[in-house]
């Protein structure tokens, strides 16, 4: 007896006869509703820029965290469910600190990304199978290690890719095509900031201000821009 489409829909570990995992596909669709995030790798470091959706004037803009530090040499931008992103980031922070404690050296960016994707593939850390579901979040992981600057992109299936530039979220299609036109490997960090913010400006539905965008760079240490620094980048547009 074959299961119906809805029964395949419910299981996160049951393939349909066409070889599809519907819950993972739906999680990937959920990211297309999230805020836009852009990452660009340059020879000096990596720049991340994210749209912050401040849905109410009563909301404190600084409490909307869309870029987080994982270790002093790694940061990540996210699109999708923020609670899911926090779970992955907390896991990555523990992994990087354990590595530093055990081996006396920072964890490489690829190993950190691998640790995040291993958890994404297990759909959580608990043994409570009935509660597990794919993480509805995609991450842009920026870092600087002995191999130089690097940018990785992860999705809910637990897959990751290394990129030179990447956009995720609701405006990702338009942003990706703009990145293809404007990106080159000789960009400076300052040019990368300007490109990332100008592309965000195109895809966002409102005026760009320090309250609704976040920018960070890893070169070689992670640094989240202050509102004044964001204002300075906006002034260059």
UniProtKB/Swiss-Prot annotation:
InterPro entries tied to this protein: Ntn_hydrolases_N, Proteasome_alpha, Proteasome_alpha-type, Proteasome_alpha_type_5, Proteasome_asu_N, Proteasome_sua/b
Isomerase is among the record's keywords: no
Alphabetical keyword list: Cytoplasm, Nucleus, Proteasome
BP term (GO), one: proteasome-mediated ubiquitin-dependent protein catabolic process
Subunit description: The 26S proteasome consists of a 20S proteasome core and two 19S regulatory subunits. The 20S proteasome core is composed of 28 subunits that are arranged in four stacked rings, resulting in a barrel-shaped structure. The two end rings are each formed by seven alpha subunits, and the two central rings are each formed by seven beta subunits. The catalytic chamber with the active sites is on the inside of the barrel.
Biological role stated in the UniProt entry: The proteasome is a multicatalytic proteinase complex which is characterized by its ability to cleave peptides with Arg, Phe, Tyr, Leu, and Glu adjacent to the leaving group at neutral or slightly basic pH. The proteasome has an ATP-dependent proteolytic activity.
Protein name (record): Proteasome subunit alpha type-5
The organism of origin for this protein: Oryza sativa subsp. japonica (Rice)
Gene this protein is translated from: PAE1
